[in-house]
From Swiss-Prot:
Active site: 122, 320
Protein name: Epoxide hydrolase srdG
Entry keywords, A to Z: Hydrolase
Triggers of expression: Expression is up-regulated during sexual development. Expression is also up-regulated during confrontation with the arthropod fungivore Drosophila melanogaster.
Annotated organism of origin: Neurospora crassa (strain ATCC 24698 / 74-OR23-1A / CBS 708.71 / DSM 1257 / FGSC 987)
Organism taxonomic ancestry: Eukaryota, Fungi, Dikarya, Ascomycota, Pezizomycotina
Amino acid sequence: MSPDALTPHDPRVTHHYITIPSTSLTYHYLLANPDSASFPHPTATVLLLHGWPDLSLGWRYQVPFLLSLGLRVIIPDMLGYGLTSAPSSPSEYSLKNLSFHMTHIIRQVNPSGQPVLLGTHDWGAFLGWRLALYYPELIKGIFAFCIPYSPPETKVTSLEEHIERHPELGYQLQNARGEVEEAVNGGSKERLRGWLNAMFGGLAKEDGGVMAFDPWKGVDVAKLEEVGGSPLVSEEVMDFYVEEYSRNGIRGPMNWYRTREINLEDELPLAEKCENWQFQVPAMIVMVGHDPALPPELTDGMEKYFAKGLRKEVIPEASHWVLIHTPEEVNKLVGEFLQQFL
């Protein structure tokens, strides 16, 4: 039996907005507070960052569990997603900019300036590691899923060069070039639904039941309306995702894949400072056994960047969508890691 999960429009969360200073960007985030009878004061605050293509609801199985520990939980729709602004320019999506945006969400909820715990998945993990680099004073612990920390690089390389070295990430080129965006944004809601089903493990009906998403290639945009339902996402939740993605289309989420050179340029000064950098907070990285693009061995040697220790875990039976695929195992590991802060 799956653990308790948030539903779309769940009364346990409240909806909040913040306009980031010096920008025209508005973020939407969910805020959940623990039961005041059991926890008159939250034990700590957790910021959860989702990945691609997801929403704040991607953490639906974790939020009730975190509330049961007395934690206050903040879950933004990331830039380009849901009810958050979706600017057209890729430059708005740099990890440096996004880190700055997160500081304002943290400070709006936590005006005392107390550091928060950080939970991340996929692109949210890429961002989370950079947030902790740029603003270490705001973070007191990190648990990340599927994306290990990698230090800033001293050389700017293109996405094409990166994919030459890592062909298992070929889908990123398809995303960056706009092929999927053009097909989905210019099509029906059924095409959008097919794309989302493909991302969440749906099968290509006319291709012998193979996965509709291939990390080496991406998706066959001509067959999106033929993709079967996701085995991981209920019809109710998928309906919600389709409505949320219908609002602004998928250019915003795809823009995250157009920022490689922007991010590397931003991080050149960090690369010099971070040669011997170590995070000064406890951290945990959780990898999975069924994600061909992100194998567990990517964490090899990662320990040297963590002065307070790094816990490394693998959930062998899980796919990339570990938060919803194996929520019991996720919550168990998160609960064990967070005990030191409670």
